[in-house]
């Protein structure tokens, strides 16, 4: 008697003729799109956090990030950092950049650390209407059991984030550290699986 595989997934096919073409909506063309993941990575001390805080400050004021960027309106931003103190580092840097700090928010991790698959991310985006979510650095938000060197686990993490950004049309920026494998191309020096760089 043939046994049925209860876990078998039904095959579904999509014809490209049924797919409706869309244009990419850009936060900052051609660098940061809405509805997509963006990774900013570099060696320690390269100024990644300084760059991202200046981007956040300008967006909070509704300012363009370069001369060609259209200025529309100020946006709300969620900025999560695991490396810098909010009171002695992040806030002073934002004030120096003349940010509208009312528009830049942080999920409180006092009672429980945050991860990329934490349901609080979606709740925070819905509650604040944030158009930008920043996780600085990637490595701190993987969760205790995730191995970032395993391709399948990296894909699962980024897929969950992708669903969020597609659903809420926000931009998600991941800040990544480079490893010390000298001589390799930058894409392969990002710490963890190359699958973070989809």
Regions found by a protein language model. Give the residues of each.
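Phosphate-binding/switch region of NTP-binding enzymes
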Residues: 39-40, 45, 49-50, 69, ...
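Interdomain "pre-motor" coupling segment immediately N-terminal to P-loop NTPase/helicase cores
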Residues: 1-3
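Conserved inter-motif catalytic segment of the P-loop NTP-binding fold
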Residues: 5-8, 14-16, 22-23, 27-29, ...
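Hydrophobic positions on the alpha1 helix immediately C-terminal to the Walker A/P-loop
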Residues: 51, 55
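Gly/Ala-rich phosphate-binding loop of Rossmann-like dinucleotide-binding domains
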Residues: 60
């Amino acid at each position: 008697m043939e046994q049925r595989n209860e876990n078998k997934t039904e095959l579904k096919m999509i014809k490209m003729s049924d797919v409706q073409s869309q244009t990419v909506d850009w936060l900052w063309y051609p660098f940061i799109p809405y509805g997509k993941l963006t990774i900013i990575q570099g060696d320690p001390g390269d100024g990644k956090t300084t760059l991202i805080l200046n981007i956040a400050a300008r967006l909070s004021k509704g300012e363009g990030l370069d001369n060609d960027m259209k200025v529309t309106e100020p946006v709300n931003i969620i900025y999560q950092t695991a490396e810098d103190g909010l009171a002695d580092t992040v806030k002073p840097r934002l004030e120096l950049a003349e940010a509208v700090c009312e528009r830049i928010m942080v999920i409180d991790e006092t009672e429980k650390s945050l991860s990329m698959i934490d349901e609080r991310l979606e709740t925070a985006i819905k509650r604040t209407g944030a158009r930008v979510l920043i996780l600085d650095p990637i490595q701190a938000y993987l969760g205790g059991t995730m191995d970032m060197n395993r391709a399948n686990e990296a894909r699962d993490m980024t897929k969950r984030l992708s669903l969020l950004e597609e659903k809420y049309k926000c931009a998600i920026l991941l800040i990544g550290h480079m490893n010390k494998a000298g001589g390799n191309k930058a894409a392969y020096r990002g710490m963890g699986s190359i699958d973070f760089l989809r």
